[in-house]
Amino acid sequence: MKFIRAAQAIVAMSLFAAIGSVAMAEPTWLDGTEKLHVVKTGGGKLGKANYALGEFTGAGGLTGTKQSRSSLFDYTIKSVKQEYNTKFTVVLPGQSEAVAVTCAGGQARADFKWVTFKRSALTYHCDYVGGGVPAGTSFDLVLSETGLMKSLEQPQRAGEFAFGDIILKAETRQVDTKMIASPGVLGYVFSRDGVDIGAISMVGFKKAIYLPKADDPNRTASALLALSLYYFNDPGNL
C-alpha cells in the first residue's frame, strides 16, 4: 500500500511539473496592448445581444445553420455537414451608421502563399459594408485539413484582414498563461508587416481580446478582426 501511494505521489508530481513546463508566460509585446472583453449591454439573449468592446459597440452573434453537401465543417467523422452563417454589426467611434458584417463558409477564394499547414479546400469569409469602413474591407480565414486523425491535433488557422491599406495577418497561437488540455483553437495573434500587434485568447469562459492602444492606427482594424473571430463558431471548438 505504501509503495502504491508513493508511486501515485511520484506520478502526481511528474504531471504537475509537466504542466508547469508547458504553461507559457504572456508574450512581452502584449504589454503594449489593451486587454478587453466583449461585454453584453442588453437587447437579447446571450450571443444575440447588444455588446461593447471598449469604444466599439454593436449587436452580434446571429448564427444560423443549414445542411449542405459541401461545407466549412467537412469532417469525415460527422454524417451531417453544416454551413454556418454569422451576422453582426459594429459601430465605429465617431460613426452613426453601423458596419454590417456577414460571414460564411464557402469554397476557397484565398490563396495565401505564406500558409505552411495542409489546408482544407474551404475557407471562412467575411464582408464589411457601411459604417465608415473602406470599400472592399474583407477577411478570409483558411483552416487546416480535417479528418479522424487530424481531429486529435491542434487545429491550425491563418487569415488576412484587408482594411484599406492595412493588411493584418491572423494565425493560431496560444497567447496566455493558462494550460488547457484541449484540442481546440486556443487563440490568435494579429500581425502587420511581421510585427505582432494584437490577439484574441479563446481560453476560458470570457475570451480576452488584446487591441493596440487607443492612439494606434491599427486599433480599428484589429477590433473588427477580433470580433470576426470572436463570433466565428469554429468547428475545431465544437
Task: Label every model-predicted segment.
Residues 1-11:
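Bacterial N-terminal signal peptides that target proteins for export
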Residues 25-238:
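Intrinsically disordered, low-complexity proline/glycine-rich segments
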Residues 10-18:
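Bacterial N-terminal signal peptides
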